Swiss-Prot record:
The name this protein goes by in its record: UPF0756 membrane protein Nther_1957
Claim: Cell membrane is one of the keywords in the record: yes
Gene Ontology, cellular component aspect: plasma membrane
Protein's organism: Natranaerobius thermophilus (strain ATCC BAA-1301 / DSM 18059 / JW/NM-WN-LF)
Family the entry assigns: Belongs to the UPF0756 family.
Keyword set, alphabetical order: Cell membrane, Membrane, Transmembrane, Transmembrane helix
Membrane-spanning intervals of the chain: 5-25, 52-72, 85-105, 111-131
Membrane topology classification: Multi-pass membrane protein
Domain of life: Bacteria
Database matches in InterPro entries: UPF0756_TM (IPR007382)
Subcellular location: Cell membrane
Length: 149
C-alpha cells in the first residue's frame, strides 16, 4: 500500500507545481478514496473510467448544438473558410491521436506519469499549456510504435 500512496502524492505534487488543477484534484480524490469505502470503485474506474470521461467531454462539446447556440449555417460557414477547414483537419488528427492515446493508457497506464511530467516541463519552461492527456498519450503512442518501443 505504501507505493500507491507515494505515487498518488507524487502525481498530486507535480500537478500542483505544473498548475494542472484537474490532475491535482484527481490525485487528491484518489488519495482520499484509497482510505475510504470508495476504494471499491477502483475496479470500475480502471475498467470504464476513460469511457466515462470521454462521454462527459463529448456531452460538453455537443451541448452548444443541443442548446441551439450553433446553427447549421455556422457549420456551413466553417467548411467554407480556410481557417475552418484547418480546424476540421486538426479535429480529425486530434481524434486519431486520442484513439491511440486511449489504447496506450489502457495497455500501459504507467505512461500517465510521464505525460504529466512532460506537461509540467512544457508549461513551465516552454510557455506552453498542458495538453489533454489523451491527445498527449496519442502522440506518445504513435512515437512509441514508430520507434518499436
Amino acid at each position: 500500500m505504501f507505493h500507491e500512496i507515494v505515487v498518488l502524492l507524487f502525481i498530486f505534487l507535480i500537478a500542483l507545481i505544473g498548475k494542472n488543477d484537474l490532475v491535482a484534484t484527481a490525485g487528491a480524490l484518489l488519495f482520499v478514496m484509497k482510505f475510504s469505502p470508495l476504494s471499491n470503485v477502483f475496479p470500475f474506474l480502471t475498467e470504464r473510467g476513460i469511457e466515462l470521461g470521454i462521454l462527459l467531454l463529448t456531452l460538453s462539446v455537443l451541448t452548444p448544438f443541443a442548446a441551439g447556440d450553433i446553427m447549421p449555417r455556422d457549420l456551413l460557414s466553417t467548411l467554407k473558410s480556410p481557417a475552418g477547414l484547418i480546424a476540421v483537419f486538426s479535429g480529425i488528427v486530434a481524434s486519431y491521436l486520442t484513439g491511440h492515446g486511449v489504447e496506450l493508457l489502457r495497455s500501459r497506464p504507467e505512461v500517465m506519469v510521464g505525460l504529466i511530467v512532460g506537461s509540467i516541463i512544457g508549461a513551465s519552461f516552454l510557455k506552453g499549456v498542458p495538453a489533454g492527456p489523451l491527445v498527449a498519450a496519442g502522440l506518445a503512442a504513435v512515437l512509441i510504435k514508430s520507434l518499436n518501443l
